[in-house]
From Swiss-Prot:
Belongs to the DUOXA family. Residues 1-21, 71-172, 221-247 are extracellular. This is Dual oxidase maturation factor 1. Possible role in maturation and transport from the endoplasmic reticulum to the plasma membrane of functional dual oxidase.
Amino acid sequence: MQANIFPFYPQPRTSFKFDTKIIEIIIICIVTACTFIIILPGIRGKSRSIWLFRILTSLFIGAVILAVNFTSDWETGIVTATTVYKSFSHSMLNASIGLWIGLKGVNITLIGNPVYQLNETINYNEEFAWESANQFDKNYKDGLERGLPYPILYVAEKFTINSPCGLFQQYCISTYYSSEIMWVAFGSWILYNVLFSMPVILYGICMMFVTAICMLVSLISFASVRQAPVCNIHFGNAVLKTHFGVSYWLSLVTGLFCLIVSLVLLFLYKTQPKVIRLIFSYGEEEDLSDKSENEEEHSSALSLNEML
């Protein structure tokens, strides 16, 4: 009888669905995009569609840079295995064990096949943050005290500071620099949008190029961890292997897109300045400014003649 008694959570817990920070970023971007679309009819001429493309493209780049800092699917892996459910128990269950690695920590999932087994609903998602070594070990000890399932604790143990695998040192360092460089990319994204709204297009193009380079360097920093010896996570004959996730590939595509756009704009700036003026809606404004300057010069000349 004692073998079937397991520790439970003090109250029912809801499994992870969506990260609220990601939802907030998506809502902010959608509201901002809708705002610009509403004021779109007030823009005259051929520059309307170009202006809309600029706004949506810039919002997409900024949203990706900001969102991937909080996602947990930079590197993912899932394995299906039959394993022990709880420590010091002989009860076995068939489940899918998932490992989701992000810049802020890891998420370890356990989903039963089927979900309802051993008189329980087997659907767990536990987050272990690595803001510091003490924080990760504290989360691991809390998991031990709460009686988390054995597969979750087994995977989390591989990332503890004292584990011989050394995964914590590898991932903590690489994700730290990846996150910091990605925040630099976000700052340069804000800066190039400000510069594009001013008559200093070349500086805006340069900052857009810097944004792309920062994103790519951040990806290289994260990918460097895979060059280290891999500590395999075994569940019987099954092995939990990881691969780059959606956030990594999305960041790569966005970084390359930003790089290509900046190089194209730089080429047009050097060879086709009229096209650049059209893209950034500077042509009409410069004509008006030239016209106003001529009118002021003409009026000042007339007043000078009257005085003479």
